[in-house]
Each structure stands twice: as C-alpha cells, then as structure tokens.
C-alpha cells in the first residue's frame, strides 16, 4: 500500500488553467500554436497523460469564447470583445405584460391524474360493425367422424392442369 502512494505522479492543475498560464507566459503577439503550447506545458509540468486531451480542451475553450483562434494560433480572448452570437435565429422579444395581471403557472407535462371523487362512468354499448360477422378469424368447427360429408359428383374431368398434348408420330416410309 505504501508503494502506491510513493509512485503516484503529482496532480496536474486543470487543463484550462494550464493553457491560460501558458499563453500568458509565452506572451506572443500573434498567439501561440498548439505545438508551442504543448511543449511549454511538458517542460513546466512534466509528462502529459495524452496529447489529444490538450487539443480537445483547446477546442472547448475556443468554442466557449475563452480563447480566440486566428491563423492556426490560440490567444486569450479580448475581454472587451462582444460575446459570440449563438447559432440559429434569436428568440423574439417578449411583450411586457401590463402591471397587475396575474400570470398563471404553465400547465404540467403529461396526462392529468384522475379525480378520485368522480362518479364511475357507465359502460359504453359496443358499436356493432356494419356486417353481422364477428371480428378476426372464425373458429374451427370440429367435424364429427360419424357424419361423412357427401363427396361432390365428378363431372368426368380430373382435377388440375391437363397434360400437354403430344403430337402423334406418323410412320414415314423411305423409298430409294
């Protein structure tokens, strides 16, 4: 157990904090590129866990407006610059309500609960469909073995497709 505590690397400060300190320390007029930032962090804080983590944090900070990105260089965002506008159409301005009006709370989501004190509803009469037949597949009627169904009288023609008519061979005599 004691060896685990000795071998633990020193804890690093959060990436955004390291990146901001790096940009302040490098203090380049046109900003610093990703490789310069990673080299400075490695020399100052030692080995980094993963190189891709730095890139993802730089992108997050760029998207949130903490950093500005120009010509492949990162620099601290100007505090006087207006905030970046979000995507899409901005919402319409809301018209102010006249004073004294009571705003009702919005309706809750979902189906409202049933009233426990309400009288039970009378059961509905089932609507019969247009035909007198019941829904679904009809029930199988079991046949009794004693009663044999009379077979249909055959008309002399067999069931199915008739066989193909073959031409009769005629005898041809060959005289020479």
Swiss-Prot record:
DNA-binding region(s), chain positions: 84-92, 106-114, 132-140, 156-164
Residue span of region Disordered: 64-176
Segments passing through the bilayer: none
Compositionally biased intervals (Low complexity): 143-157
InterPro entries on file: AT_hook_DNA-bd_motif, Histone_H1/H5_H15, HMGA, WH-like_DNA-bd_sf, WH_DNA-bd_sf
Top-rank taxon, per record: Eukaryota
GO BP field: chromosome condensation; negative regulation of DNA recombination; nucleosome assembly; regulation of DNA-templated transcription
Alphabetized GO MF terms: double-stranded DNA binding; methyltransferase activity; nucleosomal DNA binding
Signal peptide: none
Location relative to the cell: Nucleus
PANTHER family per UniProt: HISTONE H1 (PTHR11467), HMG-Y-RELATED PROTEIN A (PTHR11467:SF162)
UniProt family annotation: Belongs to the HMGA family.
Name by which UniProt lists this protein: HMG-Y-related protein A
Species name: Glycine max (Soybean)
